Amino acid sequence: MSSIVVVGTQWGDEGKGKITDFLAEQADVIARFSGGNNAGHTIQFGGETYKLHLVPSGIFYKDKLAVIGNGVVVDPVALLKELDGLNERGVSTSNLRISNRAQVILPYHLAQDEYEERRRGDNKIGTTKKGIGPAYVDKAQRIGIRMADLLEKETFERRLKENIEVKNAYFKGMFNETCPRFDEIFDEYYAAGQRLKEFVTDTSKILDDAFVAEEKVLFEGAQGVMLDIDHGTYPFVTSSNPVAGNVTVGTGVGPTFVSKVIGVCKAYTSRVGDGPFPTELFDENGHHIREVGREYGTTTGRPRRVGWFDSVVLRHSRRVSGITDLSINSIDVLTGLDTVKICTAYELDGEEITEYPANLDQLRRCKPIFEELPGWEEDITGCRTLEELPDNARKYLERISELCNVRISIFSVGPDRDQTNLLEQLW
């Protein structure tokens, strides 16, 4: 039995989808464990580019199961749109499995997301307005509707009517707005559930069977550790737990099933949305990184904020996610810069600190302490080993590994599959 968890170590958009797809070649089952269609990942497969939001990366392998675990919140209409898009391009989706315990996103969740952001004004979180947070709130309040409920007409009808009554009272009191009506939701979403019915099952049992059969299971994370609701830059975070530990809760397997945790990062840092970002760049270096790296959100299309690599962030992610191996992407984006910088610590009120603060006001006062290294001009997009990299590029990666106390097992020098290079055997 062997299993690998892939997590983002920064604020999402680190290239997890590409690394998951790369590792999926040798896996038997690929499972998502958190988030929803607020996540976006770009996959290169068969010479084509695909942008996925809910569907696991393993969907492209007909002989492997692609699992949406119970920790994922599912918008059935959005999921069907994604599946139909794949089918139209000749991709079979018959290998998809959806947990019957996954929570369902409904139109009132999207409306609530919009109203909440509007209410916050200048203090808005910067959500994708996909209804993710409100769906997780309903789950915690024990009024959420699960996939198993959606499939049963009478259950769905009863639960939906009850929830609309609750939402109407809340929307009127908080936002002076009304909830979407029952007749605007029921028929469309019940029909969507019936179309998805063939995929819905107890996915925990599927994963347990895979472990018993000593198959290889790959757990695909969404967002990044710094967006984790407990361990990220709270409150500028997502509403779930992208950390590796959530695999057990979000898929229904025990912690003893996890063998390795691959932390994915870029050779720099990027972020979509609001919140503190100590190493953020506003100069020509930032412009270079954003344009060369095509740093625009897969889901939102918004320009991402970019900055130098932050080892304080990565050490925090390594600790709270138990990262055993590092995958560094987009090293090629830094080519052409005279010098490159790594944040080694922060200065807070005149004192040097090496751990990530929990207090947001303290974090805003933090100033990055940088170590400056020489850049490189050589084209590295064809490099396949560390030895083939220019000395300065190799030393840059080695310094990251040293500062973060984790070995580099994968490095990537471009978007294509053959530009992703394995240094250590992971399966």
Swiss-Prot record:
Active site: 13, 41
Cofactor note: Binds 1 Mg(2+) ion per subunit.
UniProt pathway: Purine metabolism; AMP biosynthesis via de novo pathway; AMP from IMP: step 1/2
Record's subcellular location: Cytoplasm
Keyword Transferase among record annotations: no
Catalytic activity line of the entry: IMP + L-aspartate + GTP = N(6)-(1,2-dicarboxyethyl)-AMP + GDP + phosphate + 2 H(+)
Residue positions binding Mg(2+): 13, 40
Chain positions recorded as substrate binding sites: 298-304
Role of this protein: Plays an important role in the de novo pathway of purine nucleotide biosynthesis. Catalyzes the first committed step in the biosynthesis of AMP from IMP.
Family to which this protein belongs: Belongs to the adenylosuccinate synthetase family.
Designated name of the protein: Adenylosuccinate synthetase
The organism of origin for this protein: Staphylococcus haemolyticus (strain JCSC1435)
